[in-house]
Amino acid sequence: MSKAQTLSAADRAKLEGLIGHDFAEKERLDRALTHASARTEKGGNYERLEFLGDRVLGLCIAELLFRTFGTAGEGELSVRLNQLVSAETCAAVADELNLHLYIRTGADVKKLTGKRMMNVRADVVESLIAAIYLDGGLEVARRFILRYWQGRAVRADGAKRDAKTELQEWSHAKFGVTPIYRVDERSGPDHDPRFKVTVEVAGIKPETGVERSKRAAEQVAATKMLEREGIWQQSPAGN
């Protein structure tokens, strides 16, 4: 495996323009884009940054929702928050930034496709947020987050009801039963776990969801079942 190359000056300038921040410490940006599989001269990768970025993103999105939806209850705010900090949303932001052109990985990771590669793109976005926060402070990080999340926060599908609640009401009405959730698998490191959860409703095919928390994975599984059964309109690909 060859050593990963640092960003060229031209690529760094282009990416900083998309981010809206010129890094005082350029190494922070390089590290935020470096997967653990990549061999670099200094040996750094984005794992620790990802841990911090997840928290910064959650704080800024929670504040955005609190200020934007003044009459929403805790349940609705939680649903919106889970949608906006999900791997799918973070990966969509990564695609908007064309981060796949800049992520440094080993050869084995370059072969990943689908959900696993989506998770890599999502992780890099969180790492990037941490790098911005460390380099420019909370206000700069908040400005970046608002730039790419504010529009998503007010989309119509953000008001969708809690999937688990909706599925429970539907399954009670149709089958007289309560959905059953079980954790099938927990994988990944402690700082970035993945939970695979299956939801079962007696009489129909089960569905599974994979996310960074048990609760979020349950929501994904419930959403998939609601969409499959025609209760909810299926989200367009890429959203």
Swiss-Prot record:
InterPro entries recorded: dsRBD_dom, RNase_III, RNase_III_dom, RNase_III_sf
Keyword Iron: no
Organism for this UniProt entry: Rhizobium johnstonii (strain DSM 114642 / LMG 32736 / 3841) (Rhizobium leguminosarum bv. viciae)
Full protein name: Ribonuclease 3
Cofactor(s), names only, from the UniProt record: Mg(2+)
EC number: 3.1.26.3
Domain of life of the organism encoding this protein: Bacteria
GO cellular component terms given for this protein: cytoplasm
BP-aspect Gene Ontology terms: mRNA processing; regulation of gene expression; rRNA processing; tRNA processing
UniProt similarity note: Belongs to the ribonuclease III family.
Gene: rnc
Top EC group: hydrolase
Gene Ontology MF terms: double-stranded RNA binding; metal ion binding; ribonuclease III activity; rRNA binding
Family matches, as Gene3D superfamilies: 3.30.160.20, Ribonuclease III domain
